C-alpha cells in the first residue's frame, strides 16, 4: 500500500513539474512574441518628415515632460497667429515614429483656431525609451501629456479635446477613465483594448493558436502596466460625458473594425453623445481620400470640436 502511495505521489510530482514547465515555456514564448511586436523603438523616416517651416503661419514651442518611469517625452504646442479657442492633444499611431506623420492635420487644426499639443510617445523619435514597451504605454503617456497641459502652467486655461489615430485612437478613448474632464474626442481607426489588438495581430501569424497565449498576454500586461492595461476604450466612454466621434474604414486590415468600431456601435450606435462615420475603401488612414488629406472631413472635425466647446462655454 505504501509503495502504491509513493508511486502516485511521484507521478503527481512529475505531472506538476510538467505543468510548470509548460506554463513557463508558454510564459517565455508570450514575452518574446510581445516584445518582438511592441517593445522596440520607432523612428520617422527622414525622407518623408515634414517641418514647421513647410506650413505658412504655423508656429510651435518645444516642451519636455516626464512620463510614468521618469522617461522624458518631447512635445510641441502648435499654433497659428490667432489666439486658440481650445487645445487638442494628439496621440499618434505605432510603427512609423512619433507625431510628425500628422503634421498636415496639426496644421489644419492650428489654422482653424486651435492649439495642438502633439508629442512623441515613449520609444518614438525625440522621446526617451529603449522601446514602446506595449500598447498600454500609449494610454500612460497620454495621461501624463494631458496632465502636463492642464497643470504645468505653460498653457492657457482652455477646454481640452483629443485626437488619435490607430494606437492613438485606442489611447484617446481609454484615457477618458483618467481624464473625464475632456470635452470631445475624435478617434480614427482605433481599437477597444490592447489584448484585442494583440489577438488581431496574432491571428494573422498563428491562427487559432493565439488563444493559447492570450491569458499569458493579459497577465504580462497587468504586471507591466497595472490598471492601464485592463482599462478599455469602452471603460473610458462609461467614465466620461465627452462627445465622441468614431471613424473607421471597413477594409482596414491593420485594425479590423470588429476590434473597435463594431464594439462601440453595438452599445452607443443610438447615443446622441456619439457620432459614427464609416468608409468602405480607405484602409487604415481613413482621414485620407484618393487625392490625399480629406479637407472636407477635417472641416467636419473642426465643426465637431467647435460645437462641443461652444456648448460648454454656453453652460
How would you describe each model-predicted region?
Residues 94-108, 121:
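The serine-hydrolase catalytic nucleophile loop
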Residues 269-315:
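C-terminal catalytic histidine-bearing segment of alpha/beta-hydrolase fold enzymes
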Residues 108-128:
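Conserved alpha/beta-hydrolase
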Residues 242, 256-266:
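Short alpha-helix in the alpha/beta-hydrolase fold that links the catalytic acid
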Residues 240, 246-248, 252:
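Short beta-strand/loop motif that positions the catalytic acidic residue
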Residues 132-153:
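Alpha/beta-hydrolase active-site loop
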Residues 174-226:
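Hydrolase active-site cap/lid region
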Residues 11-66, 76:
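An N-terminal hydrophobic leader/cap segment in hydrolases
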Amino acid at each position: 500500500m505504501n509503495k502504491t502511495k509513493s508511486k502516485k505521489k511521484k507521478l503527481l510530482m512529475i505531472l506538476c513539474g510538467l505543468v510548470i514547465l509548460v506554463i513557463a515555456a508558454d510564459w517565455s514564448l508570450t514575452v518574446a512574441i510581445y516584445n518582438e511586436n511592441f517593445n522596440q523603438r520607432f523612428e520617422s523616416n527622414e525622407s518623408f518628415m515634414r517641418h514647421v517651416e513647410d506650413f505658412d503661419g504655423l508656429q510651435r514651442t518645444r516642451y519636455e515632460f516626464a512620463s510614468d518611469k521618469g522617461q522624458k517625452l518631447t512635445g510641441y504646442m502648435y499654433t497659428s497667429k490667432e489666439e486658440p479657442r481650445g487645445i487638442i492633444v494628439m496621440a499618434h499611431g505605432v510603427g512609423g515614429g512619433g507625431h510628425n506623420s500628422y503634421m498636415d492635420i496639426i496644421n489644419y487644426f492650428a489654422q482653424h483656431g486651435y492649439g495642438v499639443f502633439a508629442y512623441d510617445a515613449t520609444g518614438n523619435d525625440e522621446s526617451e525609451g529603449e522601446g514602446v514597451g506595449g500598447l498600454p504605454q500609449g494610454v500612460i503617456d497620454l495621461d501624463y501629456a494631458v496632465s502636463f497641459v492642464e497643470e504645468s502652467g505653460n498653457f492657457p486655461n482652455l477646454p481640452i479635446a483629443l485626437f488619435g489615430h490607430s494606437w492613438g485612437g485606442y489611447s484617446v478613448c481609454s484615457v477618458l477613465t483618467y481624464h473625464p474632464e475632456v470635452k470631445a474626442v475624435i478617434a480614427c481607426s482605433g481599437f477597444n483594448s490592447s489584448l484585442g489588438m494583440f489577438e488581431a495581430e496574432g491571428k494573422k501569424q498563428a491562427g487559432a493558436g493565439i488563444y493559447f497565449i492570450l491569458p499569458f498576454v493579459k497577465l504580462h500586461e497587468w504586471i507591466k502596466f497595472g490598471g492601464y492595461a485592463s482599462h478599455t476604450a469602452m471603460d473610458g466612454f462609461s467614465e466620461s460625458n465627452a462627445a465622441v466621434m468614431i471613424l473607421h474604414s471597413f477594409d482596414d486590415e491593420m485594425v479590423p473594425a470588429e476590434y473597435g468600431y463594431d464594439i462601440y456601435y453595438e452599445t452607443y450606435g443610438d447615443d446622441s453623445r456619439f457620432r459614427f462615420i464609416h468608409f468602405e475603401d480607405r484602409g487604415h488612414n481613413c482621414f485620407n481620400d484618393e487625392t490625399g488629406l480629406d479637407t472636407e472631413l477635417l472641416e467636419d472635425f473642426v465643426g465637431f470640436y467647435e460645437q462641443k466647446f461652444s456648448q460648454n462655454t454656453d453652460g
